[in-house]
From Swiss-Prot:
Lyase among keywords: yes
Catalysed reaction, written as an equation: scyllo-inosose = 3D-3,5/4-trihydroxycyclohexane-1,2-dione + H2O
GO molecular function: manganese ion binding; myo-inosose-2 dehydratase activity
Lyase in keyword set: yes
Organism: Shouchella clausii (strain KSM-K16)
Record-given protein name: Inosose dehydratase
Enzyme class at the top of the EC tree: lyase
UniProt EC number: 4.2.1.44
Amino acid sequence: MANRKIRWGIAPIGWRNDDIPEIGAENTLSHLLGDIVVARFEGTEAGGFFPEPQILNKELQLRNLKVAGKWFSSYIIRDGIASAAQAFDTHCQFLQAIGAEMAIVSEQTYSIQGLEANIFRDKPTFSKEEWKCLYEGLEELGAIAHSYGLTLAFHPHLGTGVQTKAEVDQLMAHTDPSLVSLLYDTGHAYVSDGAFLPLLDDYMDRIKHVHFKDVRSEVTDACRRDGLSFQQAFLKGMFTVPGDGCIDFTKVYRRLIRGGYDGWIVVEAEQDPNIAHPLEYALKARRYIDSYLLAGGEKQATI
């Protein structure tokens, strides 16, 4: 059931983590890109350790790889729209220079994803006035993205003010679809709400970028019970690559195909590379994709 319009990538976060720079620091750009080629993915997302465009483009061209996009931490509520817009403009200049398509935005005001706080209990919320500021700010950023030929994809994320299905509903209802699209991340949706399909079913027309992240349910239950932080939870192995956890990606992929999705699907799994060998897990994801998604096979759903 292959769709030639869909491009498959794998994120650098399995090799190195921008939030914990010491993890995987030995994995160079050449190492990462070489592993991506071996695992037969078409591209990646830019990490914080990626070099300037002139150097990066040469490395990508030599391997026939693309960069789909890059994460941007917005602080619209904390710093104001003008400040966020200025920083985002610089971000978009970089994306345009490397031939990327997606500007992945997460509002980080009050975020606890980098703190030692209970990720399952202590997520922030926004006031009515803060929500209004966020709507306006994201539309401003979306217009900037368009001016560079890019698409803004908002990333609901654990530990932020836009995490749950209800919060995504609120954001989607109050933003212009032509300016603010949605990044669909299976793992964040499942850990947040216990379900990964409702977002996909409700917002197929808004989804312009996809992360395939699997979840180890037993590890997640233990992390929830122990009140771990986001970083503690992913270092314990809460996330993994497709086919190694409890999510049935055949259901997700079929819905994407039926909905006419034609963007990137990026495998993303925060893990400790000293425990989960990056190339081993990239190959594991590749085998699952080939066997159960592109070949139209079946894998029994476990949730």
